[in-house]
Amino acid sequence: SAGRECDIAVDHSEFTNLPQAQIDECVAIMKAAGMNATVSSIHINGWFGAHNKLEGARWITRELFDIDLDATLARWVYIGDSTNDQQMFEHMPHSVGVANIARFVPQLAHLPRYVTHGERGAGFAELARAILAARP
């Protein structure tokens, strides 16, 4: 893709629990080194280049499906769980957060338009069931 080929991922919640101050410090160190940095539900990700989820979504819909994402936004739904999803929450009219997004709400400038009852994979499955049930 036109996106990043590699990044640095620092665990903050998968196998260890870093306090928010250490997460913030890690992000600051990455940014001071000229990297982009975001925080997911389990990792701090840092990378060089101007790549982001929205540009990646535009690229993949164009290259794989010959579809202009921005011209067809009403046909798409985006689901996320962390601060690194807020650009997509802002851009996508059908944006969903899984329940564990709640811990990141104080840090989000842009919230999902809907939040599932289930966390993580259960929240994704909840959304999938709702979409399938709504099909004609």
Label every PLM stretch briefly:
Residues 57, 75-118:
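Acidic, Mg2+-coordinating phosphoryl-transfer loop and its flanking beta/alpha structural elements
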Residues 44, 102, 120-122:
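Residue-level detector of flexible, active-site-proximal loop/helix-junction positions
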Residues 113-135:
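Glycine-rich phosphate-binding/hydrolytic loop that grips phosphoryl groups
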Residues 30-34, 109-112, 132:
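Generic secondary-structure transition motif, activating predominantly at the C-termini of alpha-helices
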Residues 1-77, 82-91:
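Conserved acidic, metal-coordinating active-site core of Asp-based
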